[in-house]
Amino acid sequence: MMGGKSFAEEEEEEEEEEEKKMFFWRPIEPSSAEHLAREGYAVVDDFVRDADTAKTMRDEICSMPIDDDDGDDDDDVEEEDGKESDDDASRRDDARLKPNRTHFTDARKNKRYLFSKPGVFEYDMHMKRSTNRERKEGSDGRGTTKTLERFFEATGKHLADAFNDAAKEVRDGVKVKPGDANRTVKLQINTGGAFPYHFDNPGGAQQNRKLTCILYLNEDYEDKCGGEIVLVPFMGPFVTIRPIFNRLVVFYSETVLHRVNKAVNFPGKGRVCLTIWLDGDDDENCKKNANIRNDLVQLLASPPEDLISYIRQTPDAQRFLSRWTYRDEYEISLLESHPGKGLEHMLEAHEDAVKRQRKIKDEELLRVLERVREMRNGNREEMKIIRL
């Protein structure tokens, strides 16, 4: 009809309204953006406006089959050759939760390994859409992922803008890129696993993760369940955050060291969450890591808070100093997270990394390491107990 809307246009508008109704999360407040800029993390409770929608998302994750064929009680360890195997391809295409597989580099042996983590299962929402469409139809009897699919689409369209809008008036506020190609979403069920200390953005040309956003969907969570995430802003207090229902935990992927405590006694299928990674501004990242060696040496003459502030904001400085500064914590978390075959490789590589730093021939950089260790030993911030 002339002047009127076509059927397709009306259908699209209805879908947009339904999306807003189902997925319009509570606005990200400027106070959360300010806390993120100042402390490196923020917590947003009751993130999904409609609690029933969050419950449906949890139920859809729990309806997905878990594929535990990759191993037994020990870690599955593979040496990588840079090529994708047939098994890797099938993992991408199959709509099942698969064992978490962690890349680990042993610099001393110049080898990269792939470890399957016991008790942690994941599904990447970027896997083939055809598989997801089949799941929607319920043709395989597994239930649908319709709500998760719509949430996935909404994160690509709106989540980056939500953070950017909240940070407009915040000094050094976060800036992330909107769009489907600039975010990753993974679903996860944890039936008894843990994660050692790490950064979500390990660096490299292909990594531009800026924000990690974890939405927890554990309605019956109790403290005895464990599974907390522990964040460690450099030289700050250890922040333990419980994975309670409809809680969004946000932190900088490249500069906030963190681990996950072992999940135990979770009701149902286990600890359920989904993680969204948002990419940052490329130009901004290039500026930050210009010459960390000279910057660190020059800051030796400055007050400790200036050195700490610089390290917190500089990804390459964090990667250089974190194992040295928190070497005991790294080791303990490895022991608690990898009880199988991968543990020996990881402990050896960790010890080797620390030893190589001790043997650095750059006297000024050695002074930086000594200064950082002295600051850690006298750090009163760590005495604070933060549990959220």
Language-model segments: what does each one mean?
Residues M1-M2:
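N-terminal mitochondrial targeting presequence
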